[in-house]
């Protein structure tokens, strides 16, 4: 029988006086309410300890939700939670934005109203919660659903927005703000709509700074890409590990903007796939950024900017509005690029000053041209005082036949050595460019 969560609770010393039907659940507290234990109904309506769900450690609060403005119940629990407390949400939870609190957000980001304000070193845990649904019954700017204080945790949450009150055009709240050393782990954030707020500090659905974002699923987001008003997902000095970003889409391609902005962060073992945001950019910045062992797959996006150290990633079946850019003094090594299409640009990879592009495998790359009569030059790699060595560059049959195709265009300060290409020429190398050991017409 499926468990239905009900608001039965009391002292453990009185638990045997409670009638608890099979499929029901209750919480029993110690006399001083510093400890709690979960009981379920037995087949004779007597309470029995829940196997594997006994909670006897101190500093735990259980909130039983009933679907009616559950933010009030959770706010009450969070307000009395001391450092080290875990607040457990139970049942099917429904949040509204009719009851918000001042988040006390630090200067520089302005004022936010939080629906759930998780304090310093407090954890909000959805282990016993079937789902959390947000209803946008009081639309207003500068709202955030989960505000995490320093060293706060958000864990095991299954969240989605109600698609009758949150729409593609309504003013919607930011989902998450994570402060320094906050942790977001094992959460599902699904069916989310853009905030639709034209401000650089509130144009984000997720904003994390100095925190950890691990083992989460982002699924089914409807976005509106924007110019200079933030990023849909913004990570600054964040450890972003083992997450899945999937089925992100848009109905508004009028402007280009950052789908994901990752600054001075570690971005590793993530999967980004099956998304269609044709003018949404993935943007890395900061020379200490690290992007490795990720998969970017089967998506139609704007462009990708790489910074810091990018290694051992797989980029496969991507339709790009423009190129992949490698920022100055950045390293892009040992990656696989398979089946990339550049739809509007005339360059596939743009290497910044003193960038290194080495040991990469590029196969079946296409530059899409709309006018076959147009006299225009095309570059696979453009190197501006860059180091380009030991790459395999295999083009699609159509791209291989383009007029004025330069596999590598490099200026006099660049180094181009040991590359292999299917094209008949290595490209256009300025006098003074160091060029050695390159192989052409390879098949």
Language-model segments: residues:
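Acidic Gly/Asp/Thr-rich repetitive segments characteristic of extracellular carbohydrate-active
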Residues: 59-90, 94-100
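Right-handed parallel beta-helix
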Residues: 138-140, 150-271, 276-282, 287
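Right-handed parallel beta-helix/beta-spiral solenoid domain characteristic of secreted/periplasmic
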Residues: 65-72, 94-97, 107-114, 121-173, ...
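Leucine-rich solenoid repeat scaffolds
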Residues: 404-443
């Amino acid at each position: 029988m499926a468990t239905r969560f009900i608001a039965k609770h009391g002292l453990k010393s009185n638990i045997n006086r409670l009638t608890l039907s099979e499929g029901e659940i209750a919480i029993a507290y110690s006399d001083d309410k510093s400890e709690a234990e979960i009981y379920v109904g037995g087949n004779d309506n007597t309470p029995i300890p829940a196997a594997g769900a006994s909670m006897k450690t101190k500093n735990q609060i259980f909130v039983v939700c009933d679907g009616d403005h559950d933010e009030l119940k959770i706010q009450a629990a969070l307000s009395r939670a001391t450092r080290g407390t875990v607040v457990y949400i139970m049942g099917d939870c429904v949040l509204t934005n009719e009851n918000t609190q001042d988040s006390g957000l630090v200067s520089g980001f302005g004022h936010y109203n939080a629906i759930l304000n998780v304090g310093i070193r407090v954890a909000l845990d959805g282990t016993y919660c079937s789902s959390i649904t947000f209803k946008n019954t009081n639309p207003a700017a500068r709202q955030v659903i989960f505000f995490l204080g320093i060293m706060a945790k958000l864990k095991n949450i299954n969240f989605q927005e109600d698609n009758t009150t949150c729409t593609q055009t309504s003013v919607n709240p930011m989902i998450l703000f994570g402060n320094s050393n906050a942790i977001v782990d094992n959460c599902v954030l699904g069916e989310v709509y853009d905030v639709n707020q034209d401000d650089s500090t509130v144009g984000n659905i997720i904003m994390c700074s100095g925190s950890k974002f691990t083992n989460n699923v982002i699924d089914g987001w409807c976005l509106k890409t924007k110019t200079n008003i933030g990023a849909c997902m913004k990570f600054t000095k964040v450890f972003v590990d083992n997450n899945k970003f999937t089925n992100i889409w848009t109905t508004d391609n009028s402007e280009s903007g950052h789908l994901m902005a990752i600054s001075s962060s570690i971005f590793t073992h993530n999967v980004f796939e099956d998304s269609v945001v044709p003018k949404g950019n993935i943007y890395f910045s900061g020379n200490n950024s690290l992007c490795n062992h990720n998969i970017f797959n089967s998506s139609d996006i704007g462009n990708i900017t790489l910074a810091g150290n990018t290694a051992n990633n797989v980029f496969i079946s991507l339709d790009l509005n423009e190129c992949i850019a490698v920022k100055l003094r950045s390293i892009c090594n040992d990656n696989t690029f398979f089946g990339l299409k550049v739809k509007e640009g005339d360059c596939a990879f743009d290497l910044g000053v003193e960038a290194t592009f080495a040991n990469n495998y590029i196969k079946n790359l296409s530059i899409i041209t709309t006018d076959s009569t147009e006299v225009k030059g095309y570059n696979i790699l453009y190197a501006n005082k860059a180091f380009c060595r030991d790459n395999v560059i295999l083009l699609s049959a159509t791209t291989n036949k383009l007029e004025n195709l330069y596999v590598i265009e490099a200026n006099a300060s660049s180094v181009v050595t040991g590359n292999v290409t299917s094209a008949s020429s290595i490209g256009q190398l300025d006098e003074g460019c160091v060029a050695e050991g390159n192989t052409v017409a390879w098949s």
